[in-house]
Every structure is written in structure tokens, then in C-alpha cells.
Amino acid sequence: MVYVKTNNYIRKIDELGRIVIPKEVRHKLKIQENENIMITSDDSKILISKYSYLENYYNYIKSIAEYINEIYKYGIEITDRNKKIISISPSNYFIETEIIMNSIEIGKIKIYIDNNDENQKFLKLISRIISSYFDYS
């Protein structure tokens, strides 16, 4: 029989409805200060999970990656802060940049092309297109 070790924490809710998430849990889940989390309820349970803007807009992200691959024939990989969202035709040589929203890194883009000024500008453009989508959604 396999036993899974679970950590149970008892916390009080303050007058504003806030709950402190223990440092150990935040560290284990790699939750950083000012990072968004998603709270859902299921019967008598409250579930807290990390929120990924990129994962929740997978179809939009996928279409951008497919267009870049189809038009430019570039391999592309888009990740949130923890996992790969989409990867098309990766190769050995790539350049990458962060996807920034409200001064917070929400992900990274890798494009599998040579590193030069024009390609860096193209990569930053794609990053801004993706992050600007969240400003208006």
C-alpha cells in the first residue's frame, strides 16, 4: 500500500475574507508574490491552483504559433512560467524573449531561427501581440 504524505494547514479567514497561503506551499507550487491564482469550489471544498493566462487562451496561442510556422517556416515554442503550452518544429538554434503583462513575466517565446537584430525585433513583436491580447480580453 502506498501512502501519500499530505500537508494540512489550518488557517483563519480575516475580516476581509483573506487566507494566508503558507510559505512552504507557495515555494512547492512556485507561486510568487503578485502572481494570479484561481479559486474554484467543489461541493464543500475550495480548490486553489496557479492561473496561466497562456494556458487558458490555448487556441489563440496555438493559432499564432501555427501562423508563424506556416508563413515563415520558423519553429516556435511558447511556455508559461511552468510548462510548455505549444511547440512546433523545434530545432537546435533559437532566440527567446519573455511575455510580459503588467510588468510581470507570464511566459516565454522561443523561435528557432538565427540570432540577429531583425529576428530579435520580430520576436519582441510576437511577444507584444500575445501580451496585448490579455490587456483587452
Feature-to-residue mapping (PLM):
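Short hydrophobic beta-strand segments that form the core of ligand-binding sensory/regulatory domains
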Residues: 46-50, 98-99, 105-114
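Juxtadomain coupling helices with adjacent low-complexity linkers
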Residues: 61-65, 106-108, 112-137
